[in-house]
């Protein structure tokens, strides 16, 4: 998958990086081409969290990026999805937990309802999972908190939302 950009963590002091996490993430579309977003609200080691984020999660050993995305969307959100395109890779860092992230983004569509099996930390952190028209999703990101982990998510995903908008525009023109 093509590396789109790399981002540095300017919110937490750098000490060292001791692990890399591969993460599959998706811009999940419903029949109206609305985008599925998770609303994150919590206070934890990262500080105050109040932002939106695409669903996804870590890739397990012997699991492809595509398999990881499909599994994570069902577990976190309760949807069965079909991947329709790749967007690209975005690498970033979470200095606070000494981690380098390789985020692999896909576009997928909902094809059914599955079994949601959230982890306890996801139940605590994810306050809402809902679909949003693309322009509304962009506005939500533009108005997100501009500090701490919310800023890191915003700088990682807002450019991708604009790419998804362009993708949907081109798709509608066909």
Regions found by a protein language model. Give the residues of each.
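Structural detector for helix-capping/boundary residues
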Residues: 57, 71, 84, 132-135
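Conserved Nudix-box catalytic region and its N-terminal flanking loop in Nudix hydrolases
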Residues: 34-75
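Nudix hydrolase/Nudix homology domain
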Residues: 121-174
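Active-site-adjacent beta-strand/loop module that shapes the phosphate/pyrophosphate-binding cleft
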Residues: 92-116, 130
């Amino acid at each position: 998958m093509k590396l789109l950009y790399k981002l540095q963590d300017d919110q937490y002091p750098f000490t060292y990086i001791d692990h890399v996490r591969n993460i599959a993430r998706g811009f999940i579309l419903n029949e109206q081409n609305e985008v599925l977003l998770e609303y994150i609200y919590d206070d934890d080691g990262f500080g105050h969290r109040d932002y939106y984020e695409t669903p996804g999660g870590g890739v397990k050993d012997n699991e492809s990026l595509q398999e990881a995305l499909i599994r994570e969307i069902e577990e976190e959100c309760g949807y069965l999805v079909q991947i329709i395109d790749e967007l690209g890779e975005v690498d970033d860092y979470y200095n606070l937990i000494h981690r380098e992230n390789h985020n692999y983004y896909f576009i997928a569509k909902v094809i059914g309802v599955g079994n949601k099996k959230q982890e306890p930390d996801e139940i605590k952190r994810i306050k809402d999972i809902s679909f949003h028209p693309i322009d509304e999703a962009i506005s939500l990101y533009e108005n997100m908190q501009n500090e701490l982990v919310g800023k890191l998510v915003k700088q990682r995903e807002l450019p991708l939302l604009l790419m998804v908008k362009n993708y949907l525009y081109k798709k509608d023109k066909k």
